[in-house]
A protein has these predicted regions:
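Beta-strand/loop nucleic-acid-binding surfaces
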Residues: 44-65
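Short, charged beta-turn/beta-strand-edge "cap" motif at the junction between a beta-strand
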Residues: 76-80, 108-109
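Phosphate-binding glycine-rich loops and their immediate beta-loop-alpha structural context
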Residues: 109-157
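Helix-rich effector regions associated with P-loop NTPase G domains
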Residues: 2-10, 15-19, 31, 38, ...
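Canonical P-loop GTPase G-domain recognition
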Residues: 141-195
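Short, acidic/hydrophobic/Gly-rich beta-strand patch recurrent on exposed beta strands
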Residues: 34-39, 50-52
Length: 318
């Protein structure tokens, strides 16, 4: 406990004197932090400072000392970070802070939309209490009818629990709607390699800063072009964060079995109607979740994923 109190104390420590300004950490390479002056709109080199973290702010072997997304105060002359402001939230994977939305991006063609990976991403976002949005890319490669079938399937299984934005970078479709929704926010763009994250960010920032890649014909998957998380400022108060692509994703780590139900928004209106307060919605009698599953108020895919998640998360703690 005293270690945590010491950490909180030194994380808010400030200095007198010096040429101090406030900024956001947009990149980290080894022991260097790249800080964007908060008063600057663009990511020009002269607005970014390569800084080290002041020694008294370091806790040995602690990756959370200072992470991408942190709001910091730094001495622009000495290039030293002297204060890290309190975070409103942070993600463990990738390690980021102060996020408003998790943008989950999947292609409607290749790589194939993986509903299991998508739902794992929703679980991880929900555990950190960060709202998620679904971005469907490459919609110009399918017909309007095929897109509608896709949207209907998402609606059928997830209802109104997640906003959906169909987009095409090539045809400039849906980008204005997406940009309007995320205006003034810090949004991660996460998804499998090859889904179009880099192309989307390049379009929004108006430069080909990020390398894009092609889909492997053999695996129908993309090759990783992003190896680290990076912040990009697309206007005065809107950030996109490019994150490394992936093909698999871990389940969140939960301590209590009852925590899992809270990560399924469609369960919320039925949980308190269960006969037993400790109902886990598996084999218990009088389970309102199972009753509403039979009525069609909860999708079979979502309930099966709940069981699958429960088995994987608590397999060693039954």
């Amino acid at each position: 406990m005293w270690v945590q109190k010491l950490k909180e104390l030194i994380m808010t420590e400030n200095n007198n004197g010096g040429n101090f300004i406030k900024g956001k950490i947009i990149r980290k390479i080894k022991g260097f932090y790249y800080v964007l002056d908060e008063n600057c709109i663009n990511l020009k080199e002269e607005n970014i400072y390569e800084c080290k973290l002041r020694g008294t702010l370091k806790i040995k072997n602690d990756k959370l000392n200072c992470i991408i997304g942190d709001i910091v105060e730094f001495d622009k002359d000495e290039k030293v970070i002297t204060k890290v402001e309190k975070r409103k939230n942070f993600l463990y994977r990738p390690l980021l802070s102060n996020i408003d939305f998790i943008g989950i991006l999947f292609s409607v063609v290749t790589p194939n939309f993986d509903f299991t990976v998508f739902q794992k991403m929703l679980l991880n976002a929900g555990q950190q209490d960060i709202p998620a949005i679904l971005i469907l890319s490459k919609i110009d490669l399918i017909s309007d009818e095929e897109l509608q079938i896709f949207l209907n399937e998402i609606k059928e299984n997830f209802g109104n629990t997640i906003p959906v934005f169909p987009v095409s970078v090539e045809k400039n479709i849906g980008l204005d709607n997406l940009l309007s929704y995320i205006k003034g926010k810090s949004v991660t763009v996460s998804g499998p390699s090859g889904a179009g994250k880099s192309s989307l960010i390049n379009t929004f920032i108006g430069e080909n800063i990020l390398e894009t890649n092609e889909i492997s014909e053999k695996t129908s998957r993309g090759r990783h072009t992003t190896t680290e998380s990076r912040f990009f400022k697309i206007d005065a108060d809107t950030y996109l964060i490019d994150t490394p692509g992936f093909s698999t994703l871990d389940f969140p780590k939960l301590k209590e079995k009852k925590e899992l139900e809270l990560l399924f928004p469609e369960f919320s209106e039925y949980i308190l109607q269960c006969k037993f307060r400790d109902c886990l919605h598996i084999n218990e009698p009088g389970c309102s979740i199972k009753e509403n599953l039979e009525k069609g108020n909860i999708s079979e895919m979502r309930y099966n994923f709940y069981l699958y998640s429960f088995e994987n998360i608590f397999s060693d703690n039954k």
